[in-house]
């Protein structure tokens, strides 16, 4: 917005090795996009920009035929947990990064590529 980065996230194909050691069960076992380091400037929070960002990732999945999107977040990150839940993400378990990062909730959502056609 006005040449200022207001939303940032890294979108990586199959890019989280810790997800192989999930305490829980993923919905899918195939390719996925992971969203990491996701942030919105405080002055732009609650304006729907995070929702738009995640929707764009879902569109990428449709074009590239990637079955799902995975995200992890801190247990106390209520805004992100609520956003993911409202967008159809399911809590699949916990991922442990160790050290200061510790454990986090792990979410997954089937992408548009996996939704049945009408």
Label every PLM stretch briefly.
Residues 9-37, 45:
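Conserved acyl-donor/pantetheine-binding loop and adjacent beta-alpha core of acyl/acetyltransferases
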Residues 1-2, 107-112:
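Active-site beta-strand termini and strand-to-loop segments that position acidic
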Residues 31-33, 101-108:
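Short beta-strand micro-motifs in enzyme catalytic cores
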Residues 40, 46-59, 82-86:
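Conserved acetyl-CoA-binding loop-helix of GNAT-fold acetyltransferases
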Residues 36, 41, 72-74:
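Residue-level recognition of the GNAT/N-acetyltransferase active site
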Residues 1-9:
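Conserved beta-hairpin
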Residues 72-73, 85-104:
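Conserved catalytic-core motifs of GNAT/GCN5-like acyltransferases
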Residues 54, 61-73:
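Conserved GNAT acetyl-CoA-binding A-motif
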């Amino acid at each position: 917005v006005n040449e200022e980065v207001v939303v940032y996230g890294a979108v990586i194909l199959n890019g989280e090795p810790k997800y192989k050691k999930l305490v829980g069960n993923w919905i899918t076992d195939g390719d996925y996009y992971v969203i990491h380091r996701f942030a919105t400037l405080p002055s732009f929070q609650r304006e729907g920009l995070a929702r738009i960002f995640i929707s764009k990732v879902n569109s990428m999945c449709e074009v590239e035929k990637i079955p799902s999107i995975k995200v992890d977040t801190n247990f106390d990150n209520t805004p992100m947990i609520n956003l993911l839940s409202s967008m159809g993400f399911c809590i699949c378990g916990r991922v442990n990064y160790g050290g200061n990062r510790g454990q986090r909730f792990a979410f997954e959502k089937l992408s548009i590529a996996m939704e049945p056609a009408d």
